[in-house]
Amino acid sequence: MIRLLKKLAVFLIILVGILLLGGIATAGYFAFTYREPINNYYKEGYNKISEYNTEIKKISQNIFQNNLVKTLSEVEKSLNEGRKLTQNNSFASGLDSSLNALEGSLKKINNFDSNAAFTQIKHTLNNITSFVDQMLEKFPNPNQNDDFKRYLTEVSQILFYTGISIIGAFFVSGFLLILFTKKVYGVRVSRFNPQRLLKKHLVLLLRDEEVYDAVFGN
């Protein structure tokens, strides 16, 4: 039973290895075969992201070119400065209430919230566009060169030939093992070494207690 489980485990390991290497080789084959469509998809996605990033930059610029936004931003700045003054002045309770009323009016006008100010919105948009620019710089620009297509071709060839080579080496080694050796009582020995074959026979026979006792017993 244990011997059967060992054989089954070895078979499963070999099968998983072959399937894994076959998957790698297949992925390399399809990547090489369809490198043109893949490159086109990459180019389309790269251009879309770049286009969206440009639109976000335009929105960020247009936000502060709007007169209403400029005015609200200035009012917001004045509110923040006014609150700093009232915090250090115990006689400015009346001014503080006026600031609260003004802030309440701004909330009604444009859903104004001091925690989501226009300057913070612009900074957030700028951070997003800067991050996207940095990411785009790390990837090949398909509008300027064919680096991505070249990388795809090289990697796909490496994957394909590596997978095929390892699988081929495995089957060739297995064929040579079967061709030049044979099993004797469960032990694989060389077909071209009679002395070793004889030794293997003797060792296997002497492992049997009955044979050992018959040969060396009193």
Swiss-Prot record:
Which keywords fit this entry according to its UniProt record? Answer: Cell membrane, Membrane, Transmembrane, Transmembrane helix
Q: Which residues cross the membrane?
A: 8-28, 158-178
**Compartments, record wording:** Cell membrane
Chief location bin: membrane
Membrane topology listed for this record: Multi-pass membrane protein
**Signal peptide coordinates:** none
CC annotations in GO: plasma membrane
Q: What is this protein called?
A: Uncharacterized protein MG279
Naturally occurring in which organism (per UniProt): Mycoplasma genitalium (strain ATCC 33530 / DSM 19775 / NCTC 10195 / G37)
Q: What is the lineage of its organism?
A: Bacteria, Bacillati, Mycoplasmatota, Mycoplasmoidales, Mycoplasmoidaceae
